[in-house]
Amino acid sequence: MKIVKYWDDFFDWVKGAELVELNEVNTKDDPVRPELDNKFRTAHGRKIFGLMDKKEDIEGVACVAFTNEIPSTVKELELMSKEADLVSAHRAGQVGSTAVADTLWSLKRGAGKKLMRELQKEIKKMPNIKQLVTLSPLTPMATHYHIRNGAKLIKINTTTQNFEYEIR
């Protein structure tokens, strides 16, 4: 059937997509926290991950901080990741016990789900990380995305919400 063939072609790029670490992103593309510059996103052990397709195009982005607690604001995220980074100097570079995805966005249909699955796999390789959580805005879109992708809502804050993903 033509529809099945079109559908397979439409999502074919997902099969070869892989998670890569990035040095920077166009922060204006970030629909969640465009005010955070690349310096913030990569300081104190924070990382930017991109979902790269076969053509080496970035189709989705996740910014992750490593902390020892679950933040409820960006300021807490900043302070907690700084603290975890300082402590890591005494633990052979193992930063924090909690990975916090503070912003995620996709540039292509299907990239968000694939990005989160690949991020879960990447986090599993980090022996010091015990949980993967988000610092998400209080929006129906964020709630729907995380619940649809298997996360559990663990806390609602004044301006954000935290979801927890199983580390697979």
What kind of region is each of these model predictions?
Residues 147-157:
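Conserved acetyl-CoA-binding loop of GNAT-fold acetyltransferases
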Residues 99, 124-138:
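Conserved GNAT acetyl-CoA-binding A-motif
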Residues 106-124:
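Conserved acetyl-CoA-binding loop-helix of GNAT-fold acetyltransferases
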Residues 50-52, 63, 164-168:
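Short, well-ordered beta-strand micro-motif
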Residues 1-44, 48-52, 57-58:
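Short amphipathic alpha-helix that is part of the acyltransferase structural core
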Residues 63-103:
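Conserved acyl-donor/pantetheine-binding loop and adjacent beta-alpha core of acyl/acetyltransferases
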